Regions:
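N-terminal active-site wall of soluble small-molecule enzyme domains
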Residues: 4-5, 10, 17-118, 124-129, ...
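Structural recognition of alpha->loop->beta junctions
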Residues: 27-39, 132-144, 204-207
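Active-site-adjacent loop and "lid" segments of alpha/beta metabolic enzymes
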Residues: 149-150, 156, 185-201
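C-terminal helical cap(s) of enzyme catalytic domains, especially alpha/beta-barrels
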Residues: 157-165, 202, 215-231
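Intrinsic disorder/low-complexity segments
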Residues: 165-182
Length: 231
C-alpha cells in the first residue's frame, strides 16, 4: 500500500492480551522493522501492564535511525521530560485520560522539547478535543479502552471530522504559527491485521497505521510487512 506509513510496535505484553512475546529480542525486532521499511517504531516502556522498560527504548535508539514513539500513557509533565531524556521522538497523549488543559500544555511541552505528540482519540468528542488542543498527529484507536472490543471501521467513520491541515490558531502561545499550513497526520491504531484492512484505511485518507500485536505474533515480520504493503 504505497503512500501509507507503518508505525510498528515493540511490545512484550498488554492488558488485553497478556504475554504476547515470551521470547523478546527487542533490539533485533526493531532492526527488522526498520529494514522492512517502517516509518517509526512504537515502544512500550511501562513495566507492569506492558512488561516494558526505559532500557528497551534506550537500547533501540542506539541501533535504529527512525523515530521512536514512547507509547506509555502520559499522565504528567515528568514523563514528557523523561521521554526526551531516554531518546523518544514522540509521546502519546490520550484524550480519554487527560483534560483539555493537560492536552494543550503537554502538547506545547513536547513541541518545546523538540518532540511530536500522537494525540489519541476514540470517539467524535475526543477527536474534536484533539483538534482543539492543536494536535498535528491524531490517532484513532479502534480498540475501545473500556471494553477492549476492536472495530476498524471506527477509524473510517471518524476520518471525516479531521481537517487536512492543522488549524493555526490553536498552535499554542510558545509555538510560532507556521507560514505554510502544517499537514494533519491521521493514524489508525489497533486491530489492523490484513492488507484489506490497510487498503480500506488508505482509501479513506489514513496517513499511517500503528500495528503491534499482529507484527509481534508473526515469525517473519519482514514477509508480513511486504504482504500488508501489497508487495
Amino acid at each position: 500500500a504505497d503512500g501509507i506509513s507503518f508505525i510498528c510496535e515493540v511490545k512484550k505484553a498488554s492488558p488485553s492480551k497478556g504475554l504476547i512475546a515470551p521470547d523478546f529480542p527487542y533490539v533485533e525486532i526493531a532492526k527488522e522493522y526498520e529494514a522492512a521499511g517502517a516509518s517509526a517504531i512504537s515502544v512500550l516502556t511501562e513495566p507492569f501492564y506492558f512488561k516494558g522498560s526505559n532500557q528497551f527504548l534506550m537500547d533501540i535508539k542506539n541501533e535504529v535511525n527512525i523515530p521512536l514513539l514512547r507509547k506509555d500513557f502520559t499522565v504528567d509533565e515528568y514523563m514528557i521530560y523523561e521521554a526526551k531524556v531516554i531518546g523518544a521522538s514522540a509521546v502519546l497523549l490520550i484524550c480519554a485520560i487527560l483534560d483539555d488543559e493537560q492536552l494543550a500544555s503537554y502538547l506545547r511541552l513536547a513541541h518545546k522539547l523538540g518532540m511530536s505528540a500522537l494525540v489519541e482519540a476514540h470517539d467524535e468528542d475526543e477527536v474534536r478535543r484533539a483538534i482543539a488542543c492543536g494536535a498535528g498527529i491524531i490517532g484513532v484507536n479502534n480498540r475501545d479502552l473500556r471494553t477492549f472490543t476492536v472495530d476498524i471501521m471506527n477509524s473510517v467513520r471518524l476520518r471525516k471530522l479531521i481537517p487536512d491541515t492543522v488549524p493555526a490558531t490553536h498552535m499554542g502561545t510558545e509555538v510560532p504559527v507556521p507560514s505554510v499550513p502544517q499537514k494533519m497526520v491521521y493514524v489508525s491504531e489497533s486491530g489492523i491485521k490484513t492488507k484489506e484492512d490497510i487498503d480500506r484505511l488508505k482509501a479513506n485518507g489514513t496517513d499511517a497505521v500503528l500495528i503491534g500485536e499482529t507484527f509481534m505474533r508473526s515469525p517473519d515480520k519482514k514477509k508480513l510487512f511486504a504482504e500488508l504493503r501489497g508487495e
